[in-house]
Amino acid sequence: MSQFSFTKMHGLGNSYIYVNMFEEQIPEEDLALVAEKVSNINTGIGADGMILICPSDVAPVKMRMFNNDGSEGKSCGNGLRCVAKYAYEHKLVEETVFTIETLAGIVTAEVTVEDGVVTLAKIDMGAPRLTRAEIPMLGESETPFIRENFLYNNHRYAFTAVSMGNPHAVIFVDDVEKAPLTTLGPVLETHEMFPERVNVEFIEILNEDEMNFRVWERGSGVTQACGTGACAAVVAAILNGKMERGKEITVHLAGGDLMIAWTEEGNVLMKGPAEVICRGVYEYKIEA
């Protein structure tokens, strides 16, 4: 029987099991299965996935994120805020502004601290990637995918594809509560046009400063929040002429609110909370 200490944290209800790999050891070949096991709500701890906080050669810490189906993702906005909180509070970093390595690249985090506790984290998510090759999507590699139609169940849905280090398909609807989240979501996620699958967001524009947001996450299904998805949604809204670039937009997710801005300089900034749920020790056995 093997075991490791963990901290369960969430960003707006998007929860992961966080493991400090400065102190713990999980064999590389076991990571996918362990992520699947520990995320199981019935036989594990229950979460949207597992995130490892690892040493890095190019930043103070590195984040590795695994979905609850065991697949490894390149980035996670809510996860990054929680990693920033953990790293500062556990003295893996000393400054309130620092970098985090991800499979999608290096991002900059800035934490707001009150009495030694991180209450808010802002992440510079970098510039969005808009060409089919960068997302990735099939088709002309240098061509963006903006407001293109997808026929599903005799209804045409126009979506815009954006990568924030991971792929997103953003669809604008009149009412997110009536959006076909659990039906169209998995169909688009696994569609052949997305070789690495895709996250699917349904967006309802409320006014020039606010939007409602619901998400079907690649590898996890319906979740309470998706930080990279909120960033992609704001970028898509601006590309479609629905919002202004340079303004801070409030994104209302099922789990709470994020503040997102696509700056004139080109990067996307995400600001929101990160909270600890519980800590403990997880025991597991990998069958031969």
UniProtKB/Swiss-Prot annotation:
UniProt xrefs under PROSITE patterns: DAP_EPIMERASE
UniProt entry tagged with the keyword Isomerase: yes
Catalytic activity field: (2S,6S)-2,6-diaminopimelate = meso-2,6-diaminopimelate
Main location group: cytoplasm
Protein's pathway: Amino-acid biosynthesis; L-lysine biosynthesis via DAP pathway; DL-2,6-diaminopimelate from LL-2,6-diaminopimelate: step 1/1
GO molecular function: diaminopimelate epimerase activity
Alphabetical UniProt keywords: Amino-acid biosynthesis, Cytoplasm, Isomerase, Lysine biosynthesis
Residues reported in the UniProt entry to bind substrate: 14, 67, 77-78, 166, 199, 217-218, 227-228
Domain of life: Bacteria
Cytoplasm recorded as keyword: yes
Pfam families attached to this UniProt entry: DAP_epimerase (PF01678)
Site for Could be important to modulate the pK values of the two catalytic cysteine residues, residues: 168, 217
Catalytic residues (UniProt): 76 (proton donor), 226 (proton acceptor)
GO biological process, one term: lysine biosynthetic process via diaminopimelate
Family designation: Belongs to the diaminopimelate epimerase family.
Protein name as it appears in the record: Diaminopimelate epimerase
Organism listed in the record: Bacillus cereus (strain ATCC 14579 / DSM 31 / CCUG 7414 / JCM 2152 / NBRC 15305 / NCIMB 9373 / NCTC 2599 / NRRL B-3711)
Gene symbol of the encoding locus: dapF
